[in-house]
């Protein structure tokens, strides 16, 4: 016997899905790199696309910027999200939007355009951090918007990004909770990805974990990529 979900139930599920996407974008802002960038919340907003899902994701990113970032970095982060949403809305009906590289490049360029004004008279290390965060943003967006990425894989990617927020949390100063979770999630993800893709995902995760502290040190990039 088949049961059909009534229309109010479908609407409720749709509303909950949209609110969940907005909440995810908000919480992902806690995964900060260098205390200045939150590329994975922008990647989730880029994956949401234009229209109502994109608008609610924009609100989620803005809320996360207020909660988890200082005022100036949060303002730039929210501005990048606005620019990203505007670009996706402007091109959503074109052939260009359907190209696999469009959303990853648009997300990275939105962040770079906003941040570059602030970085004009900053040291080279700040530029390197911004470029690295933008590269991670493009990579995460590409994985989330790829046609071959299953919902389970996307869930593991989101879980790995959320684990970055727990990297500073340690148990009796012995090990990082976020790093332990990140390694476990990468092991699960590597079983469902080709070896090269799994290695790249591990390297990106290690690089992101290295950049979480305000004084980054590249220690885990190679380890997680192996």
What function would you assign to each model-found segment?
Residues 2-226:
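Membrane-embedded alpha-helical hairpins and interfacial helices in multi-pass inner-membrane proteins
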């Amino acid at each position: 016997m088949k049961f059909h979900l009534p229309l109010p139930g479908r609407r409720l599920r749709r509303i909950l899905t949209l609110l969940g996407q907005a909440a995810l974008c908000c919480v992902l802002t806690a995964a900060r790199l260098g205390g200045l960038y939150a590329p994975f919340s922008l990647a989730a907003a880029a994956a949401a696309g234009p229209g109502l899902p994109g608008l609610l994701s924009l609100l989620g990113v803005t809320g996360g910027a207020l909660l988890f970032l200082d005022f100036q970095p949060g303002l730039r982060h929210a501005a990048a999200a606005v620019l990203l949403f505007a670009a996706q809305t402007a091109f959503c009906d074109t052939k260009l939007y359907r190209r696999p590289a469009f959303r990853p490049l648009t997300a990275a360029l939105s962040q770079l355009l906003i941040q570059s004004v602030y970085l004009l008279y900053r040291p080279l290390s700040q530029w390197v951090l911004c470029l690295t965060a933008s590269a991670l943003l493009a990579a995460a967006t590409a994985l989330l918007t790829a046609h071959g990425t299953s919902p389970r894989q996307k869930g593991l990617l989101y879980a790995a990004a959320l684990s970055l927020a727990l990297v500073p949390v340690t148990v009796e100063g012995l090990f990082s909770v976020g790093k332990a979770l990140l390694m476990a999630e990468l092991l699960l993800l590597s079983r469902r990805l080709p070896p090269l893709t799994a290695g790249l995902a591990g390297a990106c995760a290690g690089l992101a974990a290295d950049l979480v502290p305000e004084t980054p040190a590249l220690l885990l990039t190679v380890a997680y990529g192996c």
